[in-house]
Amino acid sequence: GHHGSGNATDLTKQILADPRVASFIQEHSLSQDEIKRSLPKFNQFLVECRKVKEGDASYIAKGYEPILTMNEGYADVTYKETRQLKEQQEQQAIAKRINLVSLPQSYRKITFADIALDDVARVDTFESLVDFVANYPSPDQKGLYIYGDMGVGKSFMLAAMAHELSETKKVATTIIHYPSFTIDVKNGIKDGSVKEQIDAVKQAEVLVLDDIGAEQFSSWIRDDVLQVILQHRMIEELPTFFTSNYSFADLEAKLSNGRQGDETWQAKRVMERIRFLAKEVHLKGVNRR
């Protein structure tokens, strides 16, 4: 009856009075006919907008918001990513470029903003990392060999650098707990995966060898694993960082102490590569743990 059509007109008025709909009609100079054909879509648009606003569970397109677009002669509803979804996807993409091996996954979330600079000793190291990221890629990009006591935040700083590189330069960094890696490689002898494991590490875009010197000494690891990785990265000029409890001199002494007694030459050869790849930095400071 008459009553029903009255309601329909009211609804139409209500729809057309909505500022988002009104401005869309104006922007696309819709004719009366086009407006009429668009009414169901205008209605759908407003219903969906209301659901989004109220956080309605029946709203299907999570992370997308409804928008009006022009189709052939009538309006249509499409969905565009919301800022939150975009940000969420960006965060996931950033985290994906940080490859952690035998290290806590929480390292993915550390950023430069998380680094405590309460300590002058830390500022220089921090600034070197900031510069490295800002200038990446550059022809003379040397990594850092950061050494210092346990718990001063060496790995933490490099995890933050990896995050920054991923976010600002879309660069992938592999951070490896070196002592665990040496055990994995030794175990790889049984299943023939040694070469594969070494290749993955030596080809990483940016590499961090964490806690070098803490591994159980082995001439084979030194000469056929570490040396091979460093040699490749040196020739290909791939940025390489290290953390250690040992200075260059102490690491060299540790690497010389082989079964054959004096293996100074082999140790020197490895150290030459490390020196070529990275600048030695002593991170002093308070234990952060």
Residue ranges and their predicted role:
Residues V171-A172, Q203-V206, E236-F242:
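Loop/turn-to-beta-strand initiation segments
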Residues P137-A159:
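Walker A/P-loop nucleotide-binding motif
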Residues I98-T125:
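Dynamic helix-loop-helix/coil hinge segments at AAA+ ATPase domain boundaries and subdomain interfaces
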